[in-house]
A protein has these predicted regions:
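Short metal-coordination and nucleic-acid-contact micro-motifs, chiefly zinc-binding Cys/His arrays
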Residues: 13, 23-32, 61-65
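Short microdomains enriched in Cys/His and/or Lys/Arg
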Residues: 53-67, 88-100
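A boundary/linker detector
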Residues: 1-19, 24, 39, 96-125
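Histidine-centered nuclease catalytic patch
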Residues: 32-64
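Conserved aromatic-histidine-acidic binding/catalytic patches
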Residues: 4, 8, 57, 75
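Short Cys/His-centered divalent metal-binding micro-motifs
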Residues: 37-41, 65-90
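Secondary-structure junction/capping motif
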Residues: 3-7, 33, 52, 69
Length: 125
């Protein structure tokens, strides 16, 4: 029986989030919030999106997703203004443009990305 697309999306979300939270950690496993700068263990932060996860064209774009503390990402709605400032005008504008482009995701593409990020996470752990 073929795997459902929703299952693949959830699996990619999980491994991509791990990768984003791990890639900028220091030797002790701590990372700074992209928007407020507070330092936390990578397991205690979120993978915060500048452009919403609902926009598949940028959902798994590494430039669009950064480590954010739960306060900034959850309680403060992602701190979009500060997120944009920290990204810089050119990159923020590019991500807004990209997020409005159509995204045609195939199961093969999702499986390829899952495999890629699983390998990247394995290297970082």
């Amino acid at each position: 029986m073929p795997v459902k697309r929703s299952t693949l999306v959830k699996k990619l979300d999980k491994v991509f989030s791990q990768y984003i939270r791990l890639k900028d950690t220091d030797h002790a496993g701590y990372v700074s919030c992209f928007t407020c700068g507070v330092t936390k263990n990578w397991r205690e932060v979120d993978a915060g999106h500048f452009q919403s996860r609902g926009k598949y064209a940028t959902r798994w774009n590494e430039d669009n997703v950064k480590c954010q503390c739960k306060r900034c990402n959850g309680f403060r709605g992602g701190e979009q203004y500060q997120f944009a400032l920290n990204l810089g005008t050119d990159l923020a504008d590019e991500l807004v443009y990209l997020s409005n482009q159509p995204a045609r995701l195939t199961n093969d593409w999702l499986l390829e990305k899952i495999k890629h990020y699983q390998q990247e996470v394995k290297k970082l752990l």
